[in-house]
UniProtKB/Swiss-Prot annotation:
GO cellular component: cytosol
The name this protein goes by in its record: Catalase-peroxidase
Cofactor binding, note field: Binds 1 heme b (iron(II)-protoporphyrin IX) group per dimer.
Organism of provenance: Acinetobacter baumannii (strain ACICU)
PROSITE patterns in alphabetical order: PEROXIDASE_2, PEROXIDASE_4
Amino acid sequence: MSNESKCPFSGHNSKPQVTVGGGTANLHWWPNQLRVDLLNQHSERSNPLGKDFNYRQEFKKLDYYALKADIKNVLTDSQDWWPADWGNYTGLFIRLAWHAAGTYRMGDGRGGAGRGQQRFAPLNSWPDNASLDKARRLLWPVKQKYGQKISWADLFILAGNIALESSGFRTFGFGAGREDVWEPDNDVNWGDEKEWLAHRNSEALAGSNLAATEMGLIYVNPEGPQASGDPRSAAPFIRATFGNMAMDDEEIVALIAGGHTLGKTHGAASADHVQADPEGAPIEQMGFGWANSYGTGVGKDAITSGLEVIWSQTPTQWSNYFFENLFKYEWVQERSPAGAIQWVAADAEAIIPDPFDPSIKRKPTMLTTDLTLRFDPEFEKISRRFLNDPQAFANAFARAWFKLTHRDMGPKARYLGPEVPAEDLIWQDPLPAASATPSSASIADAKAKIVALGLSTGELVSLAWASASTFRGGDKRGGANGARIALSPQREWEVNKKAVETLTKIEELKASTQLSLADLIVLAGNVGVEQAAQAAGFNITVPFAPGRVDALQSQTDVESFQLLLGLADGFRNWKKQGVNTPAEVLLIDKAQQLTLTAPELTALIGGLRVLGTNWDGSQHGVFTQQVGVLSTDFFTNLLDMSNVWAPVDSTSEVFEGKDRKSGTVKFTATRNDLVFGSNSILRALAEVYAQADGKEKFVQDFVAAWTKVMNLDRFDLA
């Protein structure tokens, strides 16, 4: 066989091969290209279960306690390919659950355990997730047995709970309901660093949407900032990272100590022995990564973090030894066999059992960040209290662990299973119980009273949008249910100023109707949409699902809800002062949080503009002479080549559209508006509605997208 005729897959042909998805990508040429593709993630085309699959219904068929028993059996069924420390995978499964949940950040609500993302890159290959590929594979026989009745996302967290329970610990409870997705969440910004373990400063972390001090870590470097080995300097980094998950000092101490009461770290030898992570490993590794050439590569020779630390005398049984050892001994810095900085109790006896040889004992060891709980003054106070009151520690850890593993699930209405705690917790955004569903007659009566108020279409629609559009698909917070637009902090938001003026009039109707204020607000928006459609020549009824309730101020964590404001709401042409991110980028961010597709985004912007819903009443993007009519004027005028656009100043935030021949100013617009003419994908969608046959389709699509947003938080309708 000549060289020219050799098989192109044999490795002997040096010619580059043309492959699907290969070649130079668009983002190479245009690195600032708008990521409209983020709105089309997790489509039906990537989901093997089909659009009719209902996880909540499947879970109800599950023998929950049989599942728990099977997971518990896995804990002590040590496998030769990854032998269990002390014959028990308790520590490994706790770490699996912790690291699945620990990517959550309250700033934008993204990350967390709710979608089973640890199965995919980058999380499956983060340095801090080394060896968790083994934990997931240990659970595969259980997942295989129970199939779609239990998601991977739920299984990860439940395995952590069962590991704790098997150690003798009493957990606070467990709520299922996390639905798997089938591809990575590419909308999550993990940071701009281009190297693993690149360091971030604590000031930049505080209040940011980043959840770790270094790229590829879950929280902080266990060796201290930049591996400094300084416990005191680690304190602000610990507070910043845990604070971005809404954890206070007591929860931080409880979580660190509780997580380090069981199990161990692994650092038998230099990281030079460790090969590629799962995403970069050879195909024959079958999804495993971090192959280890040291000794057997597993068991006593395992290398994960490079640290070799065991905290407790009973590493598979719950105890208070973490705090007892922390305060009892004098700690001396040492290096692990892998060369990492850790600490050993210099004045202790060898009281720690070896994980594989019962004849060997070790001295207690700690991480640099463990010692922070002793040497930071505020953490030390809490730690001493837990030292002297083990039950208080256990209670605090149980609650903090539950919060850690459920924080991204949204309201308790989403929880499934027999172990859901009865207690309502403020971070769950609790709501009162719903009363009787209003009758059709009472809904019709309420609609008539709304019409009688004489409010404009824009006023009605703006109020409903302001109420519903706080929803975040990441952590399922916000939305119209609860009518929290009537409460602090939303009532005081600048962007809601005009909406609140309308709200005061809707509030006056509540006493004379059978509807909650939350329902009245949405119904008012529906009335506005119906009036606008009728004015455009289409008689439609906007679907309305009553049953919303009104939250109390005491059920609303003001600081936590303030985060739902975000940086911009391009649907209302609002952008927070001082924010430099281009408005169109923030519009995509907002649309993605609202779980909108690109066509839904396009329809909503076009409709909201012609209905006159800008937050400040401005005319930016209102490309029509018939404000309040659900027409396609936004699209036809945007794409009209008789108009020419130019920025009004050097900021390029606001633009004037002039008649190309006369120079007369016809319209003004923001970047949120013009992007539907400038971006090739959004322009293609805008053209659909600007066509002569696009009017009816536009009304139908707008109503469908509108109804979707109004019901985003109606988990009771699923």
